[in-house]
């Protein structure tokens, strides 16, 4: 076998050995926490942040998305968000949790990303927005 064939075969088989997650059917997902910013809280038109941990996600069906703090990432998820909105799911049994990685934003745009999240929080106060500035 030539070096080229060995390299090609390795490149084809290597992704099969990698695992993007370690989820197991019937088991809880290991909790993660975000302490640098955390959950965006709106209280009487004032915004603040509190430490967030996924162990708090009990009692509701959820869609959890972890996206980059870029417009392109928001656009890629727009179809999903529109489908969720049009489904008119009950807020007492369903919640969307969005973790935004502002570390993956265009340098200097973190302030604009947070401003956009604040606008969305005002529009959809029942949704959770988590700011992760450490990636």
Predicted region positions:
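Thiol/disulfide oxidoreductase modules built on the thioredoxin-like
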Residues: 131-135
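Structural microenvironment flanking redox-active thiols in thiol-disulfide oxidoreductases
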Residues: 58-60, 66-122
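Structural micro-motif
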Residues: 124-128
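Short, flexible, glycine/charge-rich loop motifs used to bind or transfer phosphoryl groups or to couple energy/partner
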Residues: 22, 51-54, 86-87
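A short beta-strand-turn-helix
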Residues: 32-61
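Hydrophobic h-region of N-terminal signal peptides that target proteins for export
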Residues: 11-20
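Bacterial N-terminal signal peptides that target proteins for export
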Residues: 1-7
């Amino acid at each position: 076998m030539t070096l080229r064939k060995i390299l090609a075969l390795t490149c084809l088989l290597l992704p099969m050995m990698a695992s993007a997650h370690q989820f197991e059917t019937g088991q809880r997902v290991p909790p993660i926490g975000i302490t640098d910013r955390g959950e965006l809280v709106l209280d009487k038109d004032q915004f603040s942040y509190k430490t967030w941990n996924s162990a708090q996600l009990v009692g509701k069906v959820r869609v959890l998305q972890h996206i980059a703090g870029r417009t392109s990432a928001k656009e890629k998820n727009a179809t999903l968000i529109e489908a969720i909105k049009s489904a008119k799911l009950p807020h007492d049994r369903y919640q969307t949790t969005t973790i935004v990685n502002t570390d993956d934003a265009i340098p200097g745009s973190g302030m604009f990303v947070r401003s956009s999240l604040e606008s969305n929080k005002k529009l959809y106060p029942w949704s959770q927005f988590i700011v992760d500035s450490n990636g």
